[in-house]
């Protein structure tokens, strides 16, 4: 039984899908104006792991993660780089795909872009106006927050204690509103800015309406899971809930999931502090699988501390698992013990996708593997577990010369010609091949 920590209820809840065997899941993707940073990557990796685990447990997952390609930040970056907003979005979408591929992230079932849904967004806003939940003011359209039942419940806030600066309001904008907490559904454009025609004049959608429309258009009015970083609880996800449920009269999502932040050397990552690390830069010195494995060392909801030591520890541990995986696996299987490991792994992951505990079981299993010689079913079980964390080991094929040397060394040992055997071992070491002589035969690793 899978349990999920639901941000809305602030409790572990048994997962019950809308439709048996199927899951509809929407995760907020990046605003594509720059390379993603390691905090963005953690969110992408966390929900990729969750998706993979659902699939491991037999569910068919419709996994949607958007690209926000209409935003003030994109417009500003276009001015800086002297290109169009469309070119900025295309450039950083390509960079995102390259980065997350290096991290072993599976492509979403669909990666929608805001520009593909402009007509749907306009119809959504019109519907909210007709229902009395929104109003037009000087070319802008705002949502009437006071009409929303339990607004900001997700963030555990009330209208009275909301941070009025959360949406970056200006005095000019506030003057156009009926209430200072109302948020924009549609924003009129300034001269020279990218815009789309609408019943309220040329403009572009607000950030929050974009995800509501893409989610409901692709997955329907109610989805199983909506996810994203903890920073999205308010105002983004809060406003998504308000506008979506106002339009449909139905629950927007049955479970809300949020991942924790990434700290750099115990300090919150921020551009102002100069400790901002993009994945593009991190991958210049780190293997993508190492970074991915590092993220798995902490529960997805907890903050994780990015340090040189933590990353290098992840690298060492990943190498140990790789060496374990590359053993011959030519022995027998202990079916009961193997099933025990599978059951322990499922129990760990069923408890709100606790990757850290799941990885602990993987290491216990690796220790067991290294203590004996088991068959290919054990290897497959190890591979299946690791794949949930996006770790796929490609077995290295030794070239003919190295294979021949290993065979000759085995023959020399059989003939008690230990001088020749040692000479061949030393020769293999110079080629990065380390041999391990065990009671079950020779195993090798590549340094």
Residues of each region from the PLM?
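Short phosphate-binding/catalytic loops that engage adenosine nucleotides
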Residues: 59, 133, 433
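N-terminal, positively charged nucleic-acid-binding surface of large information/translation enzymes
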Residues: 9-14, 18-106, 437, 444
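Non-catalytic interaction-recognition regions
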Residues: 97-119, 123, 233, 288-290, ...
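Short, glycine/charge-rich beta-strand/loop segments that flank catalytic centers
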Residues: 67-71, 93-96, 106-121, 139-148
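Structural preference for alpha-helix termini/caps and helix-kink/transition segments
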Residues: 268-447
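Alpha-helical recognition segments enriched in aromatics with Gly/Pro capping
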Residues: 1-31, 48, 118-327
